[in-house]
């Protein structure tokens, strides 16, 4: 997977946070492959650890777009 587009799915903050957490967990198994992840549109913005997880993904070279 190189692109994950979940924009405009009306996800609550808890769901956005969970997606980001799951993606952080998957980093070690991806062998350095980067992913473009889109979670904006009608989705809630990440909160708390979701913000931290987004930063972790960006630091790993991913492109992550959220509200």
Q: Which functions belong to the PLM regions below?
A:
Residues 1-67:
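Solvent-exposed loop and capping/linker segments of extracellular ligand-binding repeat ectodomains
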């Amino acid at each position: 997977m190189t692109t994950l587009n979940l924009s405009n799915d009306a996800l609550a903050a808890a769901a956005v946070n969970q997606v980001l957490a799951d993606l952080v967990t998957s980093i070690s198994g991806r062998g350095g492959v980067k992913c473009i992840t889109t979670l904006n549109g009608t989705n809630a913005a990440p909160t708390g650890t979701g913000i931290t997880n987004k930063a972790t993904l960006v630091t790993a070279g991913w492109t992550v777009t959220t509200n």
